[in-house]
Each structure stands twice: as structure tokens, then as C-alpha cells.
Regions:
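SAM-dependent methyltransferases
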Residues: 1-2, 159
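Acidic (Asp/Glu) carboxylate-rich active-site/surface patches
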Residues: 109-110, 140, 144
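RNase III-family endoribonuclease catalytic core
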Residues: 2-113, 117, 121-122
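A generic structural signal for short coil/turn motifs at secondary-structure boundaries
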Residues: 30-31, 139-141
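Pyridoxal 5′-phosphate
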Residues: 131-135
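C-terminal edge-of-domain segments
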Residues: 143-159
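Short acidic capping loops at alpha-helix termini that bridge into adjacent secondary structure
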Residues: 125-128
Length: 159
């Protein structure tokens, strides 16, 4: 058995009048991500971490933003696809550790639902998904409330 680690990152600008979806959950907020799909930064970074750990490219390779069929797509579909590819390559998800960076809204109260949504899309127990939230202390686009970002590390074991 071998262990592999992947890292993922995503950032989206925020605009008024768009839905804010993070970790598969729609959050009450007046801004949401500008993106080709639903703009779920956590799901996108997680997808990249999983694909990278397995040596399977990145989210843009599998779901190019130039393809109209992914316009407005639910990012949970991306995670389900990544899980299918991991299964085909005989990889099991051991652990996911994520940080979402945003000034608002506060994410902590929504973590249980996010963990359930992510675990469900990946077919793993919620104990394998760990989430944290940080602010940028008012610094840069994230700190000014103009963007949201996520960093994710995923650990896989070969079966």
C-alpha cells in the first residue's frame, strides 16, 4: 500500500445577486462567486487535491470552462466524477483537510452540513472531512469581501 497527497486551491471573485455555494451548501449571503459552474471554491479545490494526488490532472482538464455543458453545473458532480476515477485507479480517500478563506459570512455554523454534503458526494464517512475557516484580516481582495478562496490537502491510500 502506498500513500499519496494532493493539494488544491481555488479562488473566485464575488458579485452581488449570485448564490453562494460552499461545500455543496447554499449559504445565506448577498454575494456569490463569479464562475462557469456554481463556483463552489471548496468543492473545486477538493477536486483538484484528489485528482492531483492520484496523478489524474486537474479540474480544468476534466471540466473545462470552455465547455457549455458545465455552465452552472453543480460542483458535487465534479467530486462524484473524481471519486469514480479514484475507484478505477484503486485509491481510497484517507483524509481531507481544508481551509476556506473569506471575510463573510461566518462558515463555522455550516460545517456539519458541508461535511455531510462533501462526504456524501465522495462516498466516505464525515470523519474523513475536516474543515476550517479563516479571514484575511481585511487584507487584499478576500479581505475587502471581493473574493473567496479555499486550500485543500487530500491524502489517498492505494488499495
Amino acid at each position: 500500500m502506498s500513500t499519496r497527497c494532493g493539494i488544491g486551491y481555488d479562488l473566485h471573485r464575488l458579485a452581488e445577486g449570485r448564490k453562494l455555494i460552499v461545500g455543496g451548501i447554499e449559504l445565506p449571503f448577498d454575494k456569490g462567486p463569479v464562475g462557469h459552474s456554481d463556483g463552489d471554491v471548496l468543492a473545486h479545490a477538493l477536486c483538484d487535491a484528489l485528482l492531483g494526488a492520484a496523478g489524474l490532472g486537474d479540474i480544468g482538464t476534466h471540466f473545462p470552462d470552455t465547455d457549455p455543458k458545465w455552465k452552472g453545473a453543480n460542483s458535487m458532480l465534479f467530486l462524484e466524477h473524481a471519486k469514480k476515477l479514484l475507484d478505477e485507479k484503486q485509491f481510497a480517500i484517507e483524509h481531507v483537510d481544508a481551509v476556506v478563506i473569506t471575510e463573510k459570512p461566518k462558515l463555522g455554523p455550516h460545517f456539519p452540513r458541508m461535511r455531510e454534503a462533501l462526504a456524501g458526494a465522495l462516498g466516505v464517512g464525515v470523519e474523513k472531512i475536516h474543515l476550517k475557516a479563516k479571514t484575511n484580516e481585511g487584507v487584499d481582495a478576500i479581505g475587502r469581501g471581493e473574493a473567496i478562496a479555499a486550500h485543500v490537502v487530500a491524502t489517498l491510500n492505494s488499495r
